[in-house]
Amino acid sequence: MAKAVTIKIKLVSTADTGFYYVAKKNSRTMTDKMTKKKYDPVARKHVEFKEAKIK
């Protein structure tokens, strides 16, 4: 069987609230770390989320 192209990653809030989203990423086309600006309900505002490994 072939290796899966998409992998699951954790997007952790840079506001240090501990909140995170789980997202999928194509490991072949997106080789660099993913960053997205999304809503953090703990901080109650839009902040940048950075990629981290799911343990």
From Swiss-Prot:
Transmembrane parts of this sequence: none
Ribonucleoprotein among keywords: yes
GO molecular function, one term: structural constituent of ribosome
InterPro entries: Ribosomal_bL33 (IPR001705), Ribosomal_bL33_sf (IPR038584), Ribosomal_zn-bd (IPR011332)
Similarity-based family: Belongs to the bacterial ribosomal protein bL33 family.
Pfam families: Ribosomal_L33 (PF00471)
Cited SUPFAM superfamilies: Zn-binding ribosomal proteins (SSF57829)
Organism: Rhodopseudomonas palustris (strain HaA2)
A cellular component term, taken from the record's GO annotations: cytosolic large ribosomal subunit
Protein name listed in UniProt: Large ribosomal subunit protein bL33
PANTHER family documented for this protein: 54S RIBOSOMAL PROTEIN L39, MITOCHONDRIAL, LARGE RIBOSOMAL SUBUNIT PROTEIN BL33M
Assigned keywords, A-Z: Ribonucleoprotein, Ribosomal protein
GO biological process: translation
